[in-house]
């Protein structure tokens, strides 16, 4: 019934198995991949005919984690998986980025890749396995895919590279780098690092590329057994049309791409395009070509004009040379009520970045296959349509916004202070108000400034820069601080963020084969120069964290109480802690180890809450005087609440000097009194006295009398 084929190799000290022919047999390609006890299913289906009216590759990649893979039931009311989580969105992009450039030009068939996590062993993150499985399924599917690709995660522990570190090793690593590519070239890099050098980062990329070669060989071996016949793809020769169009509009297109201002340039290019379309579609005549085809040729011609100009003259669209960074204006403290804010402008790219400090109540609970954890640093990136002069629908967060936000998050996280030293929840929001390339790196620069403006003690300021590449045969140009057009028309998008000490984040997407180690080395070196320059410009606004927190930010005080006192502080059903919060106005968070965090923007509120909590968590001392409230009046005395939630008895004989007939003659419920702790009886009950305390001044009368009695003797002795 099943026509199974499988390949198994040892990879990084664990078995990797790829199997096809048993599950999801109606898909064009389906592979079950197993690494350790982590299992994923990758499927590929491509439509039989091209999608009409599109001039792009209609590829969709969906990665989904099923909670049953970890032996869990989803939370929430419906008890089933809902919309994609941030992790699922990020891994979907991780799979998409290296496979998209490998589809044949002209492939317009709707193609869907779905990767489902079936089992998670809590050691091997499914994302790398998902990339491998998707590559294998595409290779088997018959779609015009110029793969396969391999992928690997690289760590850096004790000055050594580690292939596919397990989850328990991740806290120890100074680097988390994911690299993917073909047998000949690196296509994609995603990483977070603790201020590592360019040499270490490049070494990690090449280490990963070398070590996923056995995976590529395994996929090829599986394809030799089970791959479907390649789909036929008719490639149309447009060279004659391109030659005719070049003669018609070359000079005007070159002139348009010499206009430095984006909106003016787009208007000029639009007029040239109208001229080309009018030429190929004369009024009153039957069209000889498809409009999308002519538009596609024009787009190719745009790319060639820009690329030729850069390689021939060394000048870019806006007149810069390859190494120059656009003019920068950095401002901090631009919003009066925000805890921290910055406006970072680089050329025609601008980010308004705002930092908000919160408490433990504001931490984000993340429910993942590996378990639930709390995230104390959040960075959100918003890209409204007005930032590029367009209209558009505002709705849910798009995949691109999630991806760019995570890139900036990775760049900033390594320089944040440890949570035990700075116990705040930090949320950074980057609003892209203008965009012409490198908005994610503008977010990094703005985030660094906004955090320092809020008083967050970063290890060092952090900046980011986007690099590009033009490669034609043996000639190439590495471009610093690329424009949007240079991103779209170039061969590489290479984003580097870090401090003056080293790199904190590196993201690379390469659209072509042939990017050598030497080219990447040049790009990293040029990126470092650009990063140092940007840090210098940022320092004109703010070069270190402000000494005080933002005026409107909450203050947090941290202290510890004995763990056996936690229950008393919280109270039955949370009664006591709710009362503390309501009456003091402070937020209180108590952790299992007895760590207490008290937060408020009002210092007096914090002091009152701390005093209250400490009075509950510590024991009263015999002989000390305390303020209290009469809570119950009895014939034999009065019960007084003192020292937080503690109650003690003032016996009728201890209410006042002289004989007291009735307790109610001296006190009534609600009275504020001063009491001295006499001690505890045989049953542990607290004994208090009002008689020995001056109710006006709180003075200890016994101690006063004793001192007065000793004074004459002391005088005589002298």
Curated annotation (Swiss-Prot):
Catalyzed reactions: RNA(n+1) + phosphate = RNA(n) + a ribonucleoside 5'-diphosphate
Entry GO MF terms: 3'-5'-RNA exonuclease activity; magnesium ion binding; polyribonucleotide nucleotidyltransferase activity; RNA binding
Keywords associated with the record: Cytoplasm, Magnesium, Metal-binding, Nucleotidyltransferase, RNA-binding, Transferase
Record flagged with keyword Hydrolase: no
Family matches, as InterPro entries: ExoRNase_PH_dom1 (IPR001247), ExoRNase_PH_dom2 (IPR015847), ExoRNase_PH_dom2_sf (IPR036345), KH_dom (IPR004087), KH_dom_type_1 (IPR004088), KH_dom_type_1_sf (IPR036612), NA-bd_OB-fold (IPR012340), PNPase (IPR012162)
Enzyme Commission designation: 2.7.7.8
Localization in the cell: Cytoplasm
Protein's UniProt keywords contain Cytoplasm: yes
Chain spans, region Disordered: 694-718
Cofactor(s) needed: Mg(2+)
Pfam families (UniProt xref): KH_1, PNPase, RNase_PH, RNase_PH_C, S1
All copies of domain S1 motif, residue ranges: 623-691
Matches recorded under SMART domains: KH, S1
Protein's GO biological process: mRNA catabolic process; RNA processing
GO cellular component: cytosol
Binding site for Mg(2+): 487, 493
Domain KH: 554-613
CDD domains reported for this sequence: KH-I_PNPase, RNase_PH_PNPase_1, RNase_PH_PNPase_2, S1_PNPase
HAMAP family: PNPase (MF_01595)
Recorded family membership: Belongs to the polyribonucleotide nucleotidyltransferase family.
UniProt function note: Involved in mRNA degradation. Catalyzes the phosphorolysis of single-stranded polyribonucleotides processively in the 3'- to 5'-direction.
Listed name of the protein: Polyribonucleotide nucleotidyltransferase
Taxonomic classification: Bacteria, Pseudomonadati, Pseudomonadota, Alphaproteobacteria, Hyphomicrobiales
Gene from which the chain derives: pnp
């Amino acid at each position: 019934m099943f026509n199974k084929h499988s390949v198994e190799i040892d990879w990084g000290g664990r078995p990797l198995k790829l199997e096809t022919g048993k599950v999801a047999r109606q898909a064009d390609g389906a592979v079950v991949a197993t690494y350790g006890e982590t299992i994923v299913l990758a499927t590929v289906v491509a439509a039989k005919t091209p999608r009409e009216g599109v001039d792009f590759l209609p590829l969709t990649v969906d990665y989904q984690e099923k909670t049953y893979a970890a032996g869990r039931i989803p939370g929430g009311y419906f008890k089933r998986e809902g919309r994609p989580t941030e992790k699922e969105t990020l891994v979907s992009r991780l799979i998409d980025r290296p496979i998209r450039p490998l589809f044949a030009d002209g492939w317009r068939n709707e193609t869907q890749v779905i990767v489902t996590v079936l089992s998670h062993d809590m050691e091997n993150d499914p994302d790398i396995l998902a990339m491998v499985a998707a590559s294998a399924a595409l290779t088997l599917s018959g779609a015009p895919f110029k793969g396969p690709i391999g992928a690997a995660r690289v760590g850096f522990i004790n000055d050594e590279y580690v292939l596919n570190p397990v989850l328990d090793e991740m806290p120890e690593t100074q680097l988390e780098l994911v690299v993917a590519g073909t047998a000949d070239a690196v296509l994609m890099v995603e990483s977070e690092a603790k201020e590592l050098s360019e040499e270490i980062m490049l070494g990690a990329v090449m280490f990963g590329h070398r070590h996923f070669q056995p995976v590529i060989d395994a996929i090829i071996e599986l394809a030799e057994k089970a791959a479907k016949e390649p789909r036929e793809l008719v490639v149309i020769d447009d060279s004659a049309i391109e030659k005719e169009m070049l003669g018609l509009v070359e000079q005007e297109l070159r002139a348009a791409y010499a206009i430095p201002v984006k909106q003016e340039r787009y208007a000029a290019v639009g007029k040239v395009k109208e001229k080309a379309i009018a030429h190929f579609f004369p009024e009153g005549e039957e069209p000889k070509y498809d409009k999308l085809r002519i538009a596609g040729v024009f787009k190719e011609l745009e790319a060639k004009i820009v690329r030729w100009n850069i390689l021939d003259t060394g000048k870019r669209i806006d007149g810069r040379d390859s190494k120059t960074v656009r003019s920068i204006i950095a401002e901090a403290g631009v919003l009066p009520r925000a805890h921290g804010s910055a406006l970072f402008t680089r050329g025609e790219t601008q980010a308004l970045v705002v930092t908000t400090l919160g408490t433990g109540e504001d931490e984000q609970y993340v429910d993942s296959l590996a378990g639930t954890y709390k995230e104390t640093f959040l960075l959100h990136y918003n890209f409204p349509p007005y930032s590029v002069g367009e209209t558009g629908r505002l709705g849910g967060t798009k995949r691109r916004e999630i991806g760019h936000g995570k890139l900036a998050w990775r760049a900033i996280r390594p320089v944040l202070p440890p949570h035990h030293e700075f116990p705040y929840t930090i949320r950074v929001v980057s609003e892209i108000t203008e965009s012409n390339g490198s908005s994610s790196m503008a977010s990094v620069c703005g985030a660094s400034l906004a955090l320092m403006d809020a008083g967050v003690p970063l290890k060092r300021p952090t900046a980011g820069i986007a690099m590009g590449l033009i490669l034609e045969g043996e000639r190439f140009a590495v471009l610093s601080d690329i424009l949007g057009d240079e991103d779209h028309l170039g061969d590489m998008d290479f984003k580097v963020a870090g401090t003056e000490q080293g790199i904190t984040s590196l993201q690379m997407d390469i659209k072509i084969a042939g990017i050598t180690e030497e080219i990447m080395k040049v790009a990293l070196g040029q990126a470092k120069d650009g990063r140092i320059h940007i840090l210098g410009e940022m320092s004109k606004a703010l070069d270190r964290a402000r000494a005080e927190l933002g005026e409107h930010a909450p203050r947090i005080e941290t202290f510890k109480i004995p763990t056996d006192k936690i229950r008393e502080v919280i109270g039955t059903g949370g009664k006591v802690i709710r009362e503390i919060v309501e009456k003091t106005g402070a937020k209180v968070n108590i952790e299992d180890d007895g760590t207490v965090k008290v937060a408020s923007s009002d210092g007096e509120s914090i002091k009152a809450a701390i005093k209250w909590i400490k009075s509950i968590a510590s024991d009263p001392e015999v002989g000390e005087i305390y303020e209290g409230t009469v809570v119950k009046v009895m014939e034999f005395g009065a019960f007084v609440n003192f020292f937080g939630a503690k109650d003690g008895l003032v016996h009728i004989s201890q209410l006042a000097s002289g004989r007291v007939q009735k307790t109610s003659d001296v006190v009534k419920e609600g009275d504020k009194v001063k009491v001295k702790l006499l001690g505890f009886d045989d049953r542990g009950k607290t004994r208090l006295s009002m008689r020995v305390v001056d109710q006006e001044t709180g003075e200890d009368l016994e101690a006063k009398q004793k001192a007065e009695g000793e004074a004459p003797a002391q005088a005589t002795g002298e």
